[in-house]
Amino acid sequence: MSCFSFLVYFLLFIVTKMSQSPLSQSSHEFTVVSPYLSCFGIEECLFYLYFKLYDLCVILLCTWFDLSE
């Protein structure tokens, strides 16, 4: 259950970030088109890299929680 609550928190964090970021206007392009093609600025690229890193951390933490139980 701790992994599930962490995922809910992660989704809320992403929604908050997307609403605060200028990327929210082009978020549909960002998900459909390859991220490297839609990197028009430094902020968008950093946000994408941060998102992927956070996603990786969530996967690793969930795997660790599953193994520890």
Swiss-Prot record:
Main location: secreted
UniProt record, GO biological process: defense response to fungus; killing of cells of another organism
Subcellular location: Secreted
Signal peptide bounds: 1-19
GO cellular component: extracellular region
Keyword annotations from UniProtKB, A to Z: Antimicrobial, Disulfide bond, Fungicide, Plant defense, Secreted, Signal
Disulfide bonds listed in the record: C45-C57
Record's keyword annotation contains Secreted: yes
Superkingdom of source: Eukaryota
Keyword Cytoplasm found: no
Family to which this protein belongs: Belongs to the DEFL family.
Protein name: Putative defensin-like protein 312
Organism encoding this protein: Arabidopsis thaliana
